[in-house]
């Protein structure tokens, strides 16, 4: 059947990953909880806010890389807290320097770009984001980019050379789930680069829906870290991602207005 979907590898910057769940490292009670939740999630890519997390730039302070080693995880530096292109570019360059000492870290140029518009909504400033993306791509970075759910902006970011677009499902930290599935569907249908949902996931069903729609992966932090039992939620998210991907590949049944009996009517006992 020509419409049967076959699975394909999840590839970023030339590297294949088994897990389609990416996790953040903020908002946990302590580094031990961060470690346990990350392990339970099965994630291979861990994103880190360079401006808020010590990756070695602050000597004498606890270093996250001592807990989540680049020998085990692909560290994805992000530019959280940046409000203009200049700040974001500077932060990415700092991250590259900090990770350069880890020779086993294969993707020192892989970054997650986010440039925020304001503190209240944490919406992306798409104008500054596009400016930063163009500079970073020219500078040799592999840019995964947090963006709005505007399909035109997503297209422009891909055309600028970003290797993945990451539209928000809902506002960062709200747990509202996928607020505009129609725009997300347009992005998925038109994008020539991987599409990952970023921000807004609140529980396992949100992650499953994103994967059922055809997203390559989902990135989350608050949904796990703010759960009553973060480690258990991390494991739930691992299974949610798998279930959603399998359902997408399987193809859901068509929706119908009227009932259709599961058993045939022919041959009924009279």
UniProtKB/Swiss-Prot annotation:
TM helices/strands, residue ranges: none
UniProt-listed CDD domains: ThiG (cd04728)
Alphabetical keyword list: Cytoplasm, Schiff base, Thiamine biosynthesis, Transferase
Compartments, record wording: Cytoplasm
Active-site annotation: 112 (schiff-base intermediate with dxp)
Superkingdom of source: Bacteria
InterPro entries: Aldolase_TIM, Thiazole_synthase_ThiG, ThiG
SUPFAM superfamilies (UniProt xref): ThiG-like (SSF110399)
The UniProt record lists the keyword Cytoplasm: yes
Alphabetical list of Pfam families matching this protein: ThiG (PF05690)
Binding site for 1-deoxy-D-xylulose 5-phosphate: 173, 199-200, 221-222
Catalysis: reaction(s): [ThiS sulfur-carrier protein]-C-terminal-Gly-aminoethanethioate + 2-iminoacetate + 1-deoxy-D-xylulose 5-phosphate = [ThiS sulfur-carrier protein]-C-terminal Gly-Gly + 2-[(2R,5Z)-2-carboxy-4-methylthiazol-5(2H)-ylidene]ethyl phosphate + 2 H2O + H(+)
EC number: 2.8.1.10
Any GO CC annotation of this UniProt entry: cytoplasm
Task performed by this protein: Catalyzes the rearrangement of 1-deoxy-D-xylulose 5-phosphate (DXP) to produce the thiazole phosphate moiety of thiamine. Sulfur is provided by the thiocarboxylate moiety of the carrier protein ThiS. In vitro, sulfur can be provided by H(2)S.
Similarity comment text for this entry: Belongs to the ThiG family.
HAMAP family: ThiG
Complex and partners: Homotetramer. Forms heterodimers with either ThiH or ThiS.
PANTHER family documented for this protein: THIAZOLE SYNTHASE (PTHR34266:SF2)
Name of this protein: Thiazole synthase
Protein source organism: Pseudomonas entomophila (strain L48)
Gene expressing this chain: thiG
């Amino acid at each position: 059947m020509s419409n049967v979907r076959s699975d394909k590898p999840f590839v970023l910057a030339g590297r294949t990953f088994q897990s389609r769940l990416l996790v953040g490292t903020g908002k946990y009670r302590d580094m031990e909880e961060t470690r346990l939740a990350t392990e339970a999630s099965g994630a291979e890519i861990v994103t880190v806010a360079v401006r808020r997390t010590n990756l070695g730039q602050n000597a004498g302070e606890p270093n996250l890389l001592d807990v989540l080693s680049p020998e085990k995880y692909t560290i994805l530096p992000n530019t959280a807290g940046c409000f203009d292109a200049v700040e974001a570019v500077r932060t990415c360059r700092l991250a590259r320097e900090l990770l350069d000492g880890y020779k086993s870290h294969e993707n020192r140029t892989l970054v997650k770009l986010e440039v925020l518009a304001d503190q209240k909504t944490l919406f992306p400033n798409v104008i500054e984001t596009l400016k930063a993306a163009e500079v970073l791509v020219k500078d040799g970075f592999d840019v995964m980019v947090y963006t709005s759910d505007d399909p035109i902006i997503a297209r422009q970011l891909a055309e600028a050379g970003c290797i993945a677009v990451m539209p928000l499902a809902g506002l960062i930290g709200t747990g509202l789930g996928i607020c505009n599935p129609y725009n997300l569907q347009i992005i998925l249908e038109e994008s020539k680069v991987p599409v990952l949902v970023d921000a807004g996931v609140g529980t396992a069903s949100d992650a499953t829906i994103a994967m059922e729609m055809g997203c390559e992966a989902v990135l989350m932090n608050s949904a796990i870290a703010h759960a009553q039992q973060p480690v258990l939620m991390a494991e739930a998210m691992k299974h949610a991602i798998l279930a959603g991907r399998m359902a997408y590949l399987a193809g859901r049944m068509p929706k119908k207005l009227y009932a259709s009996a599961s058993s045939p009517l022919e041959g009924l006992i009279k």
